[in-house]
Amino acid sequence: MENIYLVEPSFLYEDIQVRLPYSTGLIWSHCKTNKIIEKNYKLSDILFVRDRIDKFVDNIYNPSVIGFSCFVWNWAFNNEVAKVIKEKYPDCVIVYGGQHQPSADRLKHEKDFFKKHSYVNMLVHGEGELTFEQILLENLKEKDWSKVTGITYQTNNYKFVTTLSTPRITDIDSMPSPYLDGTFNNLVEKYKDKNFRFTCTIEGVRGCPYRCTFCEIGSLYFQKLQRQSFNKLKKEIEWMSENKVVYIDNADSNFGLFEDRDLKVAKLLVYLKKKKGFPISFRNDWAKDRGERCIPIAKVLNEEDLNKGLTLAFQSLYEPTLKAIMRKNVTGKYMKEFLKKCKEENLPIYVELILGLPEETLESFKRGIFTLMNNNQHNYIGIYPLSILPNTPFGDPVYIKKYGVKYRKTKSLSYHITNTEMGSQEDEKIVCETNTMTHEEILKAHNIRWFLMICHFFGTTQFIARFFKNYLDISYESFYDKLYEYFIKKEDTVLGDEIKKFKVAIKEVFNDSRYWGWYLEDGRTWEFDEGSIFKIFKQKDQFYREIRRFIVEEIYADDLSIIDSIMEYQENALIIPDKKYPYKLNLDYNIHDVVKNNKNLMNGDYVYDIDGMPKSKNYNGDMIKWCRELYWWGRKEGRYKSIIRSYND
């Protein structure tokens, strides 16, 4: 029998958490239903845990065909493995599929691809199930790859031929599932001694109706939606719960679009977590422009702490930018009403923005963030650097030229791992300049993003800023401009030192001379924001003494007793790693009402009960656990904020 290997490597997070290889699992689940393939091929392994290249390759013996699932996070690793395999087994057919290998259109601009990657025999374009089946069947015959649809194959002298497209699957619900046909049972059994915590993927819908230019599934090819039935999803999720899967990643780009089915999915997840304890968490991308439909679903998920928050994926609030990326957002009035509704329902909201988009200016970028603050969005905002994905318009020279997009290669945006040395260091192409933002302005925007994240959206000065916004009508922009300018000149302070270090670090990132993020004492990389919070809380008392000094010198000094109350409130509004919860807090002013409800400031005896969310408190000084659970896992729902209840209401 011919040996098949499938390769879909992922990082091992915290040495125990790894993603089951959904893409290659789907490929094999379909192919093995073909009796000719079943008779003539043996799936020797699906390799999905990164390791040193030599150890990884040692798992492969006498392969006939190897299929690589390629993404931005494993591209360099796959290339190195494929090169070694080709040298060792020159007759092996190496097939690249996934999202990162060049599309047929992109190959028009990358005519030297097979010269640079001579070890690759062919590329699969679009969905892979039907195409890979054809490849395996033709491999048993004359190896006339021109008979296979949906591929580009290498010919003589690194030239290539692209065949006709494979039609999309019209009924993905009828396709076999690796969760249900035993494919993943074998993998779980193989690694049971490792005690891995598995992440699994479900695909409620394949495709997306939107055409966002930064997204790989924004092409016409994927525009028509194909959805799976609740009954099939139910069986898959039950398998995950039975196998103690901790984290489910929903590949549906618009969860909530099919609200009846998706509500059933949410209720099932809650039921299984209550009954069996798994899954612990569920991540999804919510339906765009359909926020009101998502609220009932998010409320259900929130019952059992499955929800990471309801997303508003704005990407930008600047109209010329939205036009350039073919994106339409909700109006300002709707946004305000939606945020208000979610607050009334006690639903955490987080917003997504992208830094480096076409037509965005430094001022429009800043204005967008402060607009969100002014609309009472004080929960997490994820602001992500724009990574150039090759099979998007950002890989098109015409589009790039039109908007003056320039990029630099940086280290991969991978965090919470220790095995970055295992195989090639992945890299990413991050936008460093556009026709509306110079490189220096991009760097400044990164500094602003980081600064506002640690100070406001991670909460360290948020409640002070909100107090003075309501009490003295000091705008958020004015407050944070003063805060930044004050501490940038004081490098001997906690915040000033962090500002200085980040400015150096982000320049080094774009010069490709360092990784993204900070190494902490657990030996792993953490995002810059997470790592800075960790370092600030290591010096919390000094940090807040210096913040108090800033307030007195730059903001307000008329009544120091008011400053004392707001400082005490601010410190207790965040979960502190060495505090015992719950406890009571006594203040001389109704700071809570001023901050939360914009009430007039009143003097008196005010008593508050301070607590944390269940399982998000009482860390007994374990700062790594505190930072992991609150600022890594729990940031989107604002777990780092304490729950404050007034006894004076």
Model region roles, listed by residue range:
Residues I4, V65-G67, K234-A251, G277, ...:
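Conserved C-terminal portion of the radical SAM core fold
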Residues H109-L130, K299-G309, L372-I381:
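Structural recognition of alpha->loop->beta junctions
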Residues C31, V81-I85, Y89, L269, ...:
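Hydrophobic positions in alpha-helices of CheY-like receiver
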Residues L26-N40:
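Short helix-loop-beta junction
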Residues D173-E344, L355:
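Radical SAM [4Fe-4S] cluster-binding motif and immediate context
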Residues E2-L6, N40, D58, S64, ...:
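Radical SAM enzyme core and accessory elements
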Residues K39-I169:
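Glycine-rich beta-alpha loop elements in corrinoid/cobalamin-binding modules
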Residues Y13-G25:
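Glycine- and acidic-residue-enriched helix-capping/strand-helix junction motifs
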